[in-house]
């Protein structure tokens, strides 16, 4: 009788471990599908400061605001991420000029491509970690 209970107990543990593994795999697949769904519908703006110094971080925020102000009317008619991507690609020179106007003499490089991001929390929502289409505006050496 002791052997029967021991075997049954071991079997229950095996089933519990299998169930936990299955739940983990499903949760991971769901999270990946969710991130993929979100990332296919948006383009992230990543302004990289020249350094971590306070003044450089303030300039970065002014550049961000200038780029968003430049892009807002141009992206107003975009119906999806692909249309937005095309509009951004067609306006990289204008984006660079808008950034330069706020960059206080720092060099500016503008690129559009894919980039990995950590989870980022904003007021009222969060974007999961993953790979996103990204408009990058790099100031100076981009070490900030």
Descriptions of predicted regions:
Residues 26-40:
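Aromatic-capped interface at the extracytoplasmic side
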Residues 39, 44-45, 119-122:
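Generic secondary-structure boundary/loop-capping signal
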Residues 41-92:
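Early exported N-terminus immediately downstream of N-terminal targeting peptides
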Residues 1-9:
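N-terminal Lys/Arg-rich, disordered targeting/topogenic segments
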Residues 13-29:
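Hydrophobic membrane-insertion alpha-helices, especially the h-region
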Residues 81-144:
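Mid-length scaffold segments of soluble, non-membrane domains
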């Amino acid at each position: 009788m002791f052997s029967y209970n021991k075997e049954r107990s071991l079997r229950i543990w095996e089933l519990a471990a299998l169930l936990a593994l299955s739940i983990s795999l499903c949760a991971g697949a769901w999270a990946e599908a969710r991130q993929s769904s979100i990332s296919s519908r948006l383009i992230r703006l990543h302004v990289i400061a020249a350094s971590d110094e306070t003044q450089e971080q303030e300039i970065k925020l002014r550049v961000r605001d200038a780029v968003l102000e430049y892009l807002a009317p141009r992206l107003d008619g975009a119906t999806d991420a692909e249309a937005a991507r095309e509009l951004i690609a067609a306006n990289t020179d204008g984006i660079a000029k808008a950034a330069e106007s706020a960059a206080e003499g720092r060099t500016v490089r503008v690129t559009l491509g894919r980039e990995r991001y950590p989870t980022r929390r904003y007021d009222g929502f969060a974007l999961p970690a993953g790979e996103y289409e990204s408009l990058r505006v790099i100031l100076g050496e981009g070490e900030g």
